[in-house]
Amino acid sequence: MWSQETVPDFIRTYAASRGAGSSVESGADSLLRSMDACGIDASVAVALIPEPNPKDDLVSEINDYVRMQVAGHSDRLAGFCAVNPRSPKAVDDLRRHLDTWAQGLKFHGAMQEMSVDSPSLYPIYEVMAAYGRPVLFHSGDIGVLPTKNRYTRAELFDAIACDFPSMPMILGHACRIEWSAVAGLLRKHRNVYAEISSVIGRDQATQARPLGNLLVAIKEWAGSLENVLFGSDAPLYSQADTQQNIDRLLDEPSLWESVLSADEILAVRDTNSGRFATAHNLFTTSH
């Protein structure tokens, strides 16, 4: 979630290149309208720092926007903050956000140009583990130029999960396209979750197949889809498009019926995220 003043040009260009269904329109009103249209009860709204060396004023503006947008909607919108790990104020800022409004942290290693397993991030992870709050990571590749993939490869998350087993880790985009690697992470670590936003193929004829391949790999290796969460990456990918992709997958049982049940896929769409939110009190806050 971002104000129009803080949307960088490269994200505007990416949204325009995707055509219908992709937008930079943001804010609580548009998100709640989408949720109502899709039958979604609650959503996470994240602050996004899109550059490696932002000025303090920009970081404050990005977080303040999300804080103000989710205010008054705590039953439906949970705000995740963002920090600049290169700033000497990062840990203090993080504690302040968690103490006053944020339910979690968003870290985008590709845009912030820092490997997710960097020692510079460990003081931040220590705070998140102490609070028991989730970190939502960008994981896997990124289709947005000029950002680079190397900071968020799937294998980098193993060390974090080993060193911070009490910190809930949500791997945004499910380490796209490293399905076997993310399946291995979910097999090994109980605190790791895979989120399915933008797991949508570009070939319309096989659009749902990547999601099917991901879910089959996780079921075969981790034994369950319970740690697979619904997410959309709205407004760049709409909530409706993500729901429709799951519906397409359900309509193609040949892709999954030897391994999965329809109920397991429906749980990814309808119930797993709610169970995660309840377990971590995302929408019951005293802030």
Features from the language model and the residues they span:
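Short, acidic/polar
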Residues: E25-S34, R86-H97, W179
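A generic "structured core" feature
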Residues: M1, D93, H97, I160-D163, ...
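Generic structural signal for well-ordered alpha-helices
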Residues: A28-L32, N63-V70, L94-R95, L121, ...
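Catalytic pocket-lining loop regions of alpha/beta-barrel enzymes
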Residues: Q103-G104, D117-L229, E257
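Active-site environment of divalent metal-dependent phosphoester hydrolases
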Residues: W2, P50-N53, P85-K89, Q112, ...
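Active-site gating/metal-coordination segments in enzymes
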Residues: D41-Y151
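Mid-to-C-terminal alpha-helical segments outside catalytic/metal-binding sites
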Residues: M1-A42, G223-N227, S238-H287
